[in-house]
């Protein structure tokens, strides 16, 4: 029972991620489904559910597969097969698909997959002799689910989007569930602090701290962060630049642009964390946040609680088109050291905002202020939940200086 990385419309027209109920015969490799009936009890909807299926839904589907089976993976897809009853049924779901891989001796006693206990007694009454857990081979997940089934569920006109970027855990060396929890909590606190109410858009904030992620590096790092957009504008986040020069370029483009301020500011490059909807968030990040309990700031208004405020961390490279060619904007995911910078900056900004110290807007927007010293915990590189304390020196540089910082 797998939660697919795709969006479809539910009966109310709202986007939902569907669930696939896929039956595989281990004797002959057939992918089995059923002829859907016209009632819930006869597997109305077939092998796709628009919400997480209950044990009762899965049981109804399995009964229908036994009595009205069809084969999916053949040249005659949808071909009706003779009714049959298996001796053994092994279950897995999205959260348990990788559990105990290569540890077959643990499968029979594992109860983490809810469908084992939820269907066991009813299946026994039908004559199914064994019902227990078994993980899903990674190659099956990648080749069949990811490579074949999910692409077939995407709308024909769907363009490439940020939801198809690789997940942070999947593409960033050193990114652990513990660091994800700390990073997402810091991002959620940043949203709740509403920094755009106290700080002008793209106004550079200087951060200096000593790197603790790598023992072989003891240098101090300086980088420049700034608030991007606002809730009222409908686009909001945080950007990081390596030097004051590029941070100032983004600031000037933001405030002297021709109305396309966000696109203009992006032309200055850098790294950004924009807060977006769950529908635009990489599927792997969404699944990991759900699996490991990463925090998302509550949505505003009538939106579902976890629909908005998802942090999307990207490195931006903007290339201006020449000779009439179209401008291009490429997105990649930051490295662990760069993500740690976001984690620490979020925590530093929130502490100073909550204390009423960090303000820069209006006539005083170009004035220098600080420095302030803030101590923050980082979980970058953590595998067992341990953290390290980092001392941040935070200041508002005067916006007339050509000082540049260094960033690793």
Question: Where are the model-predicted features located?
Answer:
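Secondary-structure boundary/capping micro-motif
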Residues: 1-408
